[in-house]
């Protein structure tokens, strides 16, 4: 094991013992904020230290087996123990490296998923609708809840833009690598010559702020406009100015919400989306900085990157970041995203491990 890794683990072991002692003190238990913080740290360190202690035990057993080699009667048993121990040490080293990888603090958060039609006009809007259905179907499989926050329907179906909130355990950790450009190649229903058209949509996956106050928003930086919600023919159309548009002046970010009949609820929802977008900008900047040092294409933070192509005539989906091609487009469009998402997570973890090894 590398010295830097061993030092890190020895410090973690010492810290866990400190935490055990602290958590046993009545005055610590009386301070709920402090107690919660310490128990969270204890829960994070326990699995790592547990593996480290197993590792130290195997090391000690190896030393004993090494000494047994001098005894002719015990040599065969000692050699078998040394072989088993060497394999177990390699296994534990790999597990420890993975356990030490930095955790994304947003992984367990709910998300706002934003899909925008790009090049391709009506066909792009229709594809935005297909993407929303794909993510909704995936969310249903995970037993997550999906609610539309804001929508701007396309002329012939689909969406020019749609924002949904997805509520569920690990939503951000599973879908965070979906941000970027999604390109579709297919023959539109309106195409009489059977020609393949290419169009695109942009997806942004943003972790929901635990509360709006978590993101520093100066009220003086906001322009808030109200207007009447629009509705399709025959639908209820508000007679009051219930729709809300919030403009964040320093960044130019604009959020509109008009899906609720209550101006108050629309305003609260718009503020939540704005907070998520501002938080997302911070994450993008951080990811771009990290990506430039680790040369990783996954989670680079660049929303303009084309990340995936959906080729319907060939039944093919290609993720360009990891050169993965799957010939199961119908299943994927019906929410079968597991194989894609697992491959992206594995590649991201491999990049993190490479960085950790480089530091060592």
Swiss-Prot record:
Residues where N5-methylglutamine is found: 235
Region of interest: Disordered: 285-305
Cysteines paired by S-S bonds: none
Protein name: Peptide chain release factor 1
Subcellular location: Cytoplasm
Biological function: Peptide chain release factor 1 directs the termination of translation in response to the peptide chain termination codons UAG and UAA.
Membrane-crossing residue ranges in chain numbering: none
């Amino acid at each position: 094991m590398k010295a830097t890794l061993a030092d890190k683990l020895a410090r973690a072991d010492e810290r866990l013992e400190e935490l055990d002692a602290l958590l046993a003190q009545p005055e610590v238990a009386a301070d709920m904020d402090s107690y919660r913080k310490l128990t969270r740290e204890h829960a994070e360190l326990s699995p790592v230290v547990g593996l480290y202690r197993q590792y130290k035990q195997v090391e000690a057993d190896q030393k004993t087996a090494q000494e047994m080699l001098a005894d002719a009667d015990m040599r065969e048993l000692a050699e078998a123990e040394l072989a088993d121990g060497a394999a177990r040490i390699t296994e534990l080293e790999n597990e420890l490296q993975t356990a030490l990888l930095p955790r994304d603090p947003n992984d367990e958060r709910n998300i706002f998923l934003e899909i925008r039609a790009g090049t391709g006009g009506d066909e792009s809007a229709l594809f935005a609708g297909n993407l929303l259905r794909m993510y909704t179907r995936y969310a249903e499989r995970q037993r997550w809840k999906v609610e539309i926050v804001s929508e701007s329907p396309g002329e012939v179906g689909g969406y020019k833009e749609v924002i949904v909130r997805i509520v569920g355990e690990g939503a951000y950790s599973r879908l965070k690598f979906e941000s970027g450009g999604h390109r579709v190649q297919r023959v539109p229903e309106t195409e009489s010559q059977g020609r393949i058209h290419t169009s695109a949509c942009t997806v942004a996956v943003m972790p929901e702020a635990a509360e709006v106050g978590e993101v520093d928003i100066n009220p003086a930086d906001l322009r808030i406009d109200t207007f009447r919600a629009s509705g399709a023919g025959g639908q209820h159309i508000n007679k009051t100015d219930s729709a809300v548009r919030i403009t964040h002046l320093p960044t130019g970010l604009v959020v509109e919400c008009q899906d609720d009949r209550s101006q108050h609820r629309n305003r609260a929802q718009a503020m939540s989306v704005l907070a998520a977008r501002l938080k997302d900008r911070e994450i993008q900047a951080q990811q771009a900085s990290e990506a430039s040092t680790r040369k990783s294409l996954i989670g680079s933070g660049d929303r303009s990157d084309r990340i995936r192509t959906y080729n319907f005539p060939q039944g093919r989906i290609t993720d360009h970041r990891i050169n993965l091609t799957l010939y199961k487009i119908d299943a994927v469009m019906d929410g079968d995203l597991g194989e894609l998402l697992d491959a992206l997570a594995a590649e991201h973890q491999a990049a993190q491990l490479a960085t950790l090894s480089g530091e060592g």
